[in-house]
Amino acid sequence: MDSNTITSFQVDCYLWHIRKLLSMRDMCDAPFDDRLRRDQKALKGRGSTLGLDLRVATMEGKKIVEDILKSETDENLKIAIASSPDPRYITDMSIEEISREWYMLMPRQKITGGLMVKMDQAIMDKRIILKANFSVLFDQLETLVSLRAFTEDGAIVAEISPIPSMPGHSTEDVKNAIGILIGGLEWNDNSIRASENIQRFAWGIRDEDGGPPLPPKQKRYMARRVESEV
């Protein structure tokens, strides 16, 4: 196993521990807690894949961070902060919406680009809106936390979420996953619209009539993929 992979995991475990302490002391906001829960799942998945104990990894990560801080200067810190862009966190969904349990009568799942797409194919003839929580860097979607599809009465009928045990995903991975989700829901004559944030930061467009965010060419391509899978 690559030593850098182990070191990275150990440091991630310790930094998560520090963030957890902040949360326990009520020193953070809702997006911070949201990322904390997501990263906990990711660390458990990585630990299982690597065969490493989280507690031991956290202690080793503490030693690594302490050694780095001993040699760190204020000037180096200023340079690092100045050269690093600051990602923004976009929240279409409330904590209740993103954490609510939901169930499928006719479940369908697909893995694409490190993302899990889930949808209930029993849903028919509904008006559905897509909402997502994600980070933005350089005015473009960087990391998806969760995307869910809601009916007009608030029921959850589909979801896209990162797979904790797999490496990260790209903006294109998210676009493809949304295309699969839209195609699957439209198969049953549902009407889909995406939130303005999804349209703006995933595709760089604003759809004034609230229609699906996919460009026609890509939407047709995704629909054909879904038809062949169904």
UniProtKB/Swiss-Prot annotation:
Motif (Nuclear export signal) spans which residues?
A: 137-146
Protein task: Inhibits post-transcriptional processing of cellular pre-mRNA, by binding and inhibiting two cellular proteins that are required for the 3'-end processing of cellular pre-mRNAs: the 30 kDa cleavage and polyadenylation specificity factor/CPSF4 and the poly(A)-binding protein 2/PABPN1. In turn, unprocessed 3' end pre-mRNAs accumulate in the host nucleus and are no longer exported to the cytoplasm. Cellular protein synthesis is thereby shut off very early after virus infection.
From the UniProt entry, list the residue stretches annotated as the region Disordered: 208-230
* Organism this protein belongs to: Influenza A virus (strain A/Pintail/Alberta/121/1979 H7N8)
Q: Subunit composition?
A: Homodimer. Interacts with host TRIM25 (via coiled coil); this interaction specifically inhibits TRIM25 multimerization and TRIM25-mediated RIGI CARD ubiquitination. Interacts with human EIF2AK2/PKR, CPSF4, IVNS1ABP and PABPN1.
What name does the UniProt record give this protein? Non-structural protein 1
Q: Where is this region: RNA-binding and homodimerization?
A: 1-73
Q: Which InterPro entries match?
A: NS1, NS1A, NS1A_effect_dom-like_sf, uS15_NS1_RNA-bd_sf
Q: Does the keyword Translocase apply?
A: no
Q: Where is this region: CPSF4-binding?
A: 180-215
Q: What is known of its domains?
A: The dsRNA-binding region is required for suppression of RNA silencing.
Q: Which GO terms describe its molecular function?
A: protein serine/threonine kinase inhibitor activity; RNA binding
Output the GO biological process annotations, alphabetical, semicolon-separated: symbiont-mediated suppression of host cytoplasmic pattern recognition receptor signaling pathway via inhibition of RIG-I activity; symbiont-mediated suppression of host gene expression; symbiont-mediated suppression of host mRNA processing; symbiont-mediated suppression of host PKR/eIFalpha signaling; symbiont-mediated suppression of host type I interferon-mediated signaling pathway
Q: What is its main location?
A: host cell
Gene name on record? NS
A family per Pfam: Flu_NS1
Q: Out of the domains of life, which is the source? A: Viruses
Q: How is it modified after translation?
A: Upon interferon induction, ISGylated via host HERC5; this results in the impairment of NS1 interaction with RNA targets due to its inability to form homodimers and to interact with host EIF2AK2/PKR.
